[in-house]
């Protein structure tokens, strides 16, 4: 019986024997694709090839692609652990044809791999296939070409309420490439409930889809018209976990070898004896998605991809808590994961220390609030009415205890309770955007500028070339000519202009000819062509016209200083902070460089100085900057770093600066590092959880920045009547004096507040034996209010005190309750009730709570509501 690792390798070997290029799995973070939250199919990395926007050196490819479906449109998270086949992470085996073979070979390849004794050797009588209802060609190939009996071939029509809306018709989106597909199903046998595809019992587990073969033969336009593609292509996908379950003779994916080893380790770490416990499945699944997301540069955070990762980690930790885990355990699964993933685990192995560290830190952080949050949820669930948990409670768990909604839903599901999601959404307000980042992703591929041919880039050696205009786009539409004053995108056959890529902004300059000038403000890539974006200043410009393309060299030189300095900065960061530093984004312009990178801990000022000194050391070393073109595998073997969000071909350009820095890069650089002159870090900050940003200037920009700082220093010294060398000492003296004065003032305020408290005590009213004071006080800060409340609680014995004060346009509220009453009156609930009247919110302990608001005109309403509530509840 084959292991999962052996099945993965057999698939790749089979298609390699059929002339396919084996292509590595792409990152789970899609490269240059804003339409996807995560890579969720094997074809994602080839999408631009299918769209005609990119080319490869091969026309046949095969992959074992890592995929994540959690968050956004494709979200399996809530079902993971409760079904036999839902996962957050899975591997998609695929073979692809880019205008090479089509239906005949695609079908025969699939059948041979599945049924040949040399490969998987599945019994033919166990296999069924579906085809699109009108796809007679595929039907004929299956029946006549392969020999599948007609009672094992099922036609599936439009079963989703619209033309071409079918389980057997695939589309990339509302527009773009699409076509019929054929699916292969495996029959697990009569002992398993379920019916054939298309039947009422098709959702059962007897007949399981193992392979989907898509025939991309149409391009759907916005009006629904189907155009035939000039080069039909093939995209296939077979879930590795599903086919492993078939080969290993089990009905559930969680019973295959890789999951059984992970489940056994989870059971060992948590002490769980029942190996069928669903929580074991959840954790075994989640370690795979979490580890590989971190490997591909995702950091737990409160937005976008990072928030999805945080949700998955916290769901796993909560299920560990259910199993009885008493200590951090999740990160301890990483070594087992590396082992069970075999060759596919090498990427995790390379970053094992960082993966384990981030998982441990996230688990420790969540553990601080998990038990308190679960206690609150348990209390709320006991009091649930009509089987619905209020959205307000769900939001409090999210906002205060870090419980993602799906984690709360997980707990509720176990007790057959649903969540008032509408109420939760109302409470979320602006914060709802955190978990919904995927909803912003989308594009209409027919609006992409698409031009046949390519632009030859001459910019590495030239700043001016003669070129021909091959296309013009005005207001998004292709035109034959433009006139003075019109802004447009100009496509050339050759160009010295660098198009924005790798964080480096596009070149500026001009296109000139007799009586014609087009000012280029930016340069962008559109597939294989370069677009020169700008405005025609003089004359007319026509398609086919020959022009001179002239780069603004001053702008380019300044940009190149910053780009080369960015490489030195990246190397310095890794040397000072550690090899876990990975680029998360960058901007290289003519005025500044910005570098975002993964770093779980804060960077000290001393570390920033060390990084800055290291960069300047290598600038002074005046290293020769060497560029070479080589196969990507050779570049990686030499240690060249590939950068976040960049797409690389089979042959890459490597930029090396001495022995200090080596990166894959297509940008413009200096010839020697000494040309940079000077490097100065101007800021270092955190921009998200686990992501830091460094901004810096170079050359003349660095000198200007230092001169500006010198001016500020001298002006500050003049204002404080000090010299620059004594400025820190002078500021310290002023701070000490201010603190002393502030302390004296606060003491006077507290003394005054205690006197006021004695006077206020006389105004207390009694409600059923409880002293009650509800008042608005003038000219009081929050500290003074708390002093008065504490003093009154001591004076009055059994009491409830509620104060409101106005400071300019803000409202402050303080509520105090003596401890004997906190079972009946909770300060936090009462202060929130009052705060709602003045447009605010707050919280605190049962005996003392504070809140703020922004509607002072409603103070009287807050006081009235408080009085009414106390009369009703005391």
Curated annotation (Swiss-Prot):
It is found in: Cytoplasm. Its cofactor is Zn(2+). InterPro entries: aa-tRNA-synth_II/BPL/LPL (IPR045864), Ala-tRNA-lgiase_IIc (IPR002318), Ala-tRNA-ligase_IIc_anticod-bd (IPR018162), Ala-tRNA-synth_IIc_core (IPR018165), Ala-tRNA-synth_IIc_N (IPR018164), Ala-tRNA_ligase (IPR050058), Ala_tRNA_ligase_euk/bac (IPR023033), DHHA1_dom (IPR003156). This is Alanine--tRNA ligase. One of its GO terms (molecular function) is ATP binding. Its main location: cytoplasm. CDD domains: AlaRS_core (cd00673). PROSITE patterns: AA_TRNA_LIGASE_II_ALA. Its EC number is 6.1.1.7. GO terms for cellular component: cytosol. Consists of three domains; the N-terminal catalytic domain, the editing domain and the C-terminal C-Ala domain. The editing domain removes incorrectly charged amino acids, while the C-Ala domain, along with tRNA(Ala), serves as a bridge to cooperatively bring together the editing and aminoacylation centers thus stimulating deacylation of misacylated tRNAs. Keywords: Aminoacyl-tRNA synthetase, ATP-binding, Cytoplasm, Ligase, Metal-binding, Nucleotide-binding, Protein biosynthesis, RNA-binding, tRNA-binding, Zinc. Pfam families: DHHA1, tRNA-synt_2c, tRNA_SAD. SMART domains: tRNA_SAD. Catalyzes the attachment of alanine to tRNA(Ala) in a two-step reaction: alanine is first activated by ATP to form Ala-AMP and then transferred to the acceptor end of tRNA(Ala). Also edits incorrectly charged Ser-tRNA(Ala) and Gly-tRNA(Ala) via its editing domain. It comes from Histophilus somni (strain 2336) (Haemophilus somnus). Zn(2+) binds at residues 563, 567, 665, 669.
């Amino acid at each position: 019986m084959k292991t999962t690792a052996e099945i993965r390798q057999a698939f790749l070997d089979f298609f390699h024997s059929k002339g396919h290029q084996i292509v590595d799995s792409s990152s789970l973070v899609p490269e240059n694709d804003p339409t996807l939250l995560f890579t969720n199919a094997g074809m994602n990395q080839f999408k631009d090839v299918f769209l005609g926007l990119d080319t490869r050196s091969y026309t046949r490819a095969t992959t074992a692609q890592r995929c994540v479906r959690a968050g956004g449109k494709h979200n399996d998270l809530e079902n993971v652990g409760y079904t036999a086949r839902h996962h957050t992470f899975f591997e998609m085996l695929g073979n692809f044809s880019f205008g090479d073979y089509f239906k005949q070979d695609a079908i025969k390849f699939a059948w041979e791999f599945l049924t040949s004794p040399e490969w998987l050797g599945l019994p033919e009588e166990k296999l069924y296939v579906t085809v699109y209802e009108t796809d007679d060609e595929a039907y004929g190939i299956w029946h006549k070409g392969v020999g599948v009996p007609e009672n094992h071939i099922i036609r599936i029509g439009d079963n989703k309420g619209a033309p071409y809306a079918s389980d057997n018709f695939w589309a990339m989106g509302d527009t773009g490439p699409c076509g019929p597909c054929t699916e292969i199903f495996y029959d697990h046998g009569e002992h398993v409930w379920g019916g054939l595809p298309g039947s009422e019992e098709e959702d059962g587990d007897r007949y399981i889809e193992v392979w989907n073969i898509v025939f991309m033969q149409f391009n759907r336009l916005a009006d629904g018209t189907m155009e035939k593609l000039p080069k039909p292509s093939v995209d296939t996908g077979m879930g590795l976990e599903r086919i492993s379950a078939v080969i290993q003779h089990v009905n559930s994916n969680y019973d295959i070898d890789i999951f059984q080893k992970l489940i056994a380790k989870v059971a060992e770490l948590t002490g769980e004896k029942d190996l069928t416990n669903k929580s074991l499945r959840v954790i075994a699944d989640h370690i795979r998605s979490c580890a590989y997301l971190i490997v591909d540069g995702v950091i737990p955070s409160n937005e976008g991809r990072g928030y999805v990762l945080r949700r998955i980690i916290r769901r796993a930790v909560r299920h560990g808590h259910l199993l009885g885990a008493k200590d951090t355990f999740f990160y301890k699964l990483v070594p087992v994961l590396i082992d069970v993933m075999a060759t596919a685990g090498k990427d995790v192995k390379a970053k094992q220390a960082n993966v384990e560290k981030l998982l441990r830190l996230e688990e420790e952080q969540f553990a601080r609030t998990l038990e308190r949050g679960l206690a609150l949820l348990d209390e709320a669930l006991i009091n649930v009415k009509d089987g619905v948990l209020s959205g307000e409670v769900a939001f409090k768990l999210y906002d205060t205890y870090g419980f993602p909604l799906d984690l709360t839903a997980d707990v509720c599901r176990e007790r057959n309770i649903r969540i008032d999601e509408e109420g939760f959404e109302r409470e979320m307000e602006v914060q709802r955007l955190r978990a919904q980042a995927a909803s912003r992703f989308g594009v209409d591929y027919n609006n992409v500028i698409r031009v046949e041919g390519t632009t030859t880039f001459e910019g590495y050696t030239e700043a001016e070339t003669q070129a021909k205009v091959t296309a013009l786009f005005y207001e998004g539409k292709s035109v034959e000519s433009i006139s003075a004053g019109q802004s447009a995108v100009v496509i050339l056959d050759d160009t010295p202009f660098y198009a924005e890529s790798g964080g480096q902004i596009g070149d500026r300059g001009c296109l000139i000819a007799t009586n014609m000038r087009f000012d280029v403000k930016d340069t962008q890539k559109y597939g294989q062509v370069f677009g020169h974006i700008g405005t025609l200043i003089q004359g007319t410009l026509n398609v086919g016209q020959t022009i001179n393309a002239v780069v603004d060299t001053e702008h380019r030189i300044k940009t190149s200083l910053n780009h080369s300095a960015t490489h030195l900065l990246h190397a310095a960061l890794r040397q000072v902070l550690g090899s876990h530093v990975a680029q998360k984004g960058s901007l290289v312009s003519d005025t500044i460089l910005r570098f975002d990178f993964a770093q779980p801990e804060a960077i000290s000022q001393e570390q920033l100085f060390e990084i800055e000194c290291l960069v300047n050391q290598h600038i002074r070393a005046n290293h020769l900057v060497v560029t070479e073109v080589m196969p990507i595998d050779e570049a990686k073997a030499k240690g060249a770093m590939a950068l976040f969000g960049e797409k690389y071909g089979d042959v890459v350009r490597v930029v090396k600066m001495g022995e200090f820095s080596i990166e894959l890069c297509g940008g413009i650089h200096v010839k020697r590092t000494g040309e940079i002159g000077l490097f100065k870090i101007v800021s270092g900050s955190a921009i998200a959880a686990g992501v830091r940003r460094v901004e810096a200037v170079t050359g003349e920009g660095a000198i200007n920045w230092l001169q500006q700082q010198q001016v500020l220093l001298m002006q500050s010294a003049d204002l404080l009547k000090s010299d620059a060398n004594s400025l820190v000492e002078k500021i310290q003296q002023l701070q000490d004096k201010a603190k002393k004065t502030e302390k004296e003032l606060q003491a006077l305020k507290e003394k005054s507040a205690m006197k006021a408290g004695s006077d206020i005590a006389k105004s207390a009213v009694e409600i059923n034996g409880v002293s009650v004071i509800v008042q608005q006080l003038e000219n009081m800060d929050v500290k003074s209010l708390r002093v008065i409340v504490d003093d009154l609680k001591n004076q009055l014995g059994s009491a409830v005190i509620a104060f409101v004060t106005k400071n300019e346009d803000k409202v402050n509220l303080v509520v105090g309750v003596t401890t004997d009453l906190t079972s009946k009156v909770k300060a936090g609930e009462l202060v929130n009730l009052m705060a709602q009247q003045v447009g605010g919110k707050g919280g605190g302990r049962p005996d003392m709570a504070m809140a703020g608001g922004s509607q002072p005109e409603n103070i009287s309403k807050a006081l009235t509501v408080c009085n009414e509530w106390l009369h009703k509840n005391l």
